[in-house]
Amino acid sequence: MPADRLTTLEIRAAEQERTIEELSGQIAEQWTVIERMQRKLDALTDRFLALEEQAAPDVPVTKPPHW
């Protein structure tokens, strides 16, 4: 294998390795953001359900007046 071809392959391999490392870092950051957003969504859902329970009083089951 000629030296220049080997050098080209080594350069490509190094570039691909760098790209993979960058993408891996970006994925890790995205997962951190996703986990934080999921926690916020869970907290907001809990707050919403609590407010919904407070706002909607229990409606008693009664028969209409014509019964």
UniProtKB/Swiss-Prot annotation:
A Pfam family that the UniProt record links to this protein: SlyX
Family named by the database record: Belongs to the SlyX family.
Name of the protein in its database record: Protein SlyX homolog
Source organism of this protein record: Mesorhizobium japonicum (strain LMG 29417 / CECT 9101 / MAFF 303099) (Mesorhizobium loti (strain MAFF 303099))
Classification of source organism: Bacteria, Pseudomonadati, Pseudomonadota, Alphaproteobacteria, Hyphomicrobiales
Gene (name only): slyX
